[in-house]
Amino acid sequence: MVRASLIWLNYNSLGFIDIALRSIGSALRLDFDDYEVVIVDNASGDGSFERIRKFVEEKRPSSVRVKFVRSDANRGYAGGMNLGWEAKDPETKYVAFLNNDLIVEPNSLRELIDYMESDDKLAAVSGLVYLGNSKRIYSAGDYVTDHWIAGGVCGNGLEHECPGISKPHYVTYAEGAYMLVNAEIVRRAYPGGKPFIDETFLYLDDALLGLILWNKGYKTAYIPIKSGYHYANLTTKPVMNYYGLRANTALIMLLDTRFSWIKPFYLFRRDLGYKVLCLFRDEYCRAHRSFLDGYNLAQILRSKIGFKLDLHKAPYVKIGYLDFILFDFMMLNRIHYKSSIITHEMLTNPQSI
């Protein structure tokens, strides 16, 4: 039995192999005595898996147990992490999930576990993640608004722009690029006893985990420790627009908020808008395909979850009715969210832990 398992996911990382090797190298050198690293490769075809395996075999400390899992297909974040979940030590108490473009701080796993030990209802946590090698923040935990926008708390801000960042806070969900979960709680609370639903593939997975945990009576939190540096979207950049819109459409359909009464019109407007714009530009045809795939994904997820997700059972960002009209129906949403920083104080019930 090990106390913690770290699942590290790779897919076609040859184009940024230096960062991927730094990432797995940091995962092998954590200041923690009792853990294993499960390396999952999502059927990479660019030779990156072979480079990574050679690096690990040469650099692995003798005290760290390593398992390699090679998928027969690209299963995305959700399916790949689930493969690692199935391969981990079945008795492990905590499981960390780590992207191949994130370099972890040596003390982070131990410090995250120390916080989790203090509350038996704490199911998932993440720390302070910086954007690449800059001083800008990628995530201090993650939020969902009541008009179905998700993102990183303090995202793209600097520490002095984020009051409360030095204290732990409950958040809507933990950051999936590097988060820690209580394995037993996930087995009890999540459909199929696994941390993710395979069909989500990419995006939505960490948000769905947090929302389900809150709806089941558990908690997710941001812990104020420097946990890592994320060179974001190096793997997903070619498909992020498609999967991002797909995930957002599914989230709208699945998640009940105080704006749920307007969902039918909201979705109809999107559907019609993409159809009309598709007549003029191909990119909107692709967007419409993504929208329809998100609609179908929501049907699958709803049947697997088995109950309605209520945002009000989690901390969330409350949007005013005027803001909802301006930012969504007058198409100002993208401009607003690129220019604003969501802080912990903006979440409902922003109490420290």
Task: Place the predicted regions along the sequence by residue.
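Short, acidic, metal-binding catalytic loop of nucleotide-sugar glycosyltransferases
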Residues: 23-34
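Catalytic donor-sugar/metal-binding loop of nucleotide-sugar-dependent glycosyltransferases
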Residues: 192-201, 207-228
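Glycine-rich, basic loop-to-helix element that forms the pyrophosphate-binding segment
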Residues: 70-88
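A conserved acidic beta->alpha catalytic loop
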Residues: 15, 23, 41-52, 73
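Acidic/His-rich active-site region of diverse nucleotide-sugar glycosyltransferases
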Residues: 70, 79, 110-195, 199, ...
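Acidic donor-binding/catalytic loop of UDP-sugar-dependent glycosyltransferases
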Residues: 47, 102-115
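Active-site-adjacent helix/loop segment of glycosyltransferases
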Residues: 7, 219-303, 307-320
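Short beta-strand-to-loop acidic/aromatic patch adjacent to the donor-nucleotide binding site
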Residues: 91-103
